[in-house]
């Protein structure tokens, strides 16, 4: 009989989907297991017959499914306003590029966000965060990018820090100052990139407000040369990088980000084989964002088969934002990734667990159920992981465990 230490907590009688790639079973499934949690981490995984049937801090899950906590590795959670009117325009034939050229798109949200009080932004973002938590999310990336000026970018990152301080969910904050050219720099995008590189990145990094730098390398964003200035600035300071790339066209953004050992290349609908090979060589995760593909009614799908062939890890994220993916649901993103992009349900699960952790640089502590990893996991009223992907309108979450505590 396994001896427990004072303070240990046990979840027994579980069907465990570890998402550990070293296990041969689909999803890393193993039955009749018990998790021993100690000081917020998984201490051990043992057959339940090795543990007492009952006792203090022993939870009998009656055969329920347990998976790692979900990870949403790409969101734009902090913003004000909505862009419902633009959506209606698009349904009436206007393109995303046309709307952006008319002052809509990202800049419309920038105006609303700049005008919004920090406390209001916090309350809006907190409600969104808790919606994701209710689906089993335990680690969440939050990008800035709706300020496009130093003061408001800092305000957005302070909101992310305040959310993190609640200890309800892990937050990975990302500086996305190079999201779009603000109206006041419309005729001088290079001047805006200078502001980003010489002021925003170093000052906000010094304040410890973000973990990584992101950018939007696209025909309606920044060109390759401008994007590289951002990457060079970040890497000179030792800051991890990532990029929104190849969403609407093939510019070579994935190759660029991979050359700087980017954590991830996101969207990647127009990615080609050269870019896929560069991602493999750079250790860069491909992040699929099916919500934006669906909402923009795009037709160019990411090259999933190429990513498989080159063994590039593929993550899946909600891309929750007001303009192109107003879906605050990682379950829905998993379903869309399967239906629209052809992922298998197991690939979708890997995409919101171990591969999503890698996209945030957290692969040594998050995204799998293994001894030594964080005790972030979800108990489901389900028999198989595929059920969560199959029926996104139903949430079978039974219990969410964060840092070893039921939350």
Swiss-Prot record:
Main location: cytoplasm
Annotated InterPro entries: Amidohydro-rel, HutI, Metal-dep_hydrolase_composite, Metal_Hydrolase
Enzyme Commission code(s) on record: 3.5.2.7
Pathway noted in the entry: Amino-acid degradation; L-histidine degradation into L-glutamate; N-formimidoyl-L-glutamate from L-histidine: step 3/3
Residues annotated to bind Fe(3+): 74, 76, 244, 319
Gene3D superfamilies (UniProt xref): Metal-dependent hydrolases, Urease, subunit C, domain 1
Cofactor(s) this protein requires: Zn(2+); Fe(3+)
Catalytic activity annotation: 4-imidazolone-5-propanoate + H2O = N-formimidoyl-L-glutamate
EC class: hydrolase
GO biological process: L-histidine catabolic process to glutamate and formamide; L-histidine catabolic process to glutamate and formate
Keywords, alphabetical: Cytoplasm, Histidine metabolism, Hydrolase, Iron, Metal-binding, Zinc
Binding locations of N-formimidoyl-L-glutamate: 146, 321, 323
Pfam families documented for this protein: Amidohydro_1 (PF01979)
Cellular component terms (Gene Ontology): cytoplasm
Function noted in UniProt: Catalyzes the hydrolytic cleavage of the carbon-nitrogen bond in imidazolone-5-propanoate to yield N-formimidoyl-L-glutamate. It is the third step in the universal histidine degradation pathway.
Similarity-based family: Belongs to the metallo-dependent hydrolases superfamily. HutI family.
Protein name: Imidazolonepropionase
Gene (name only): hutI
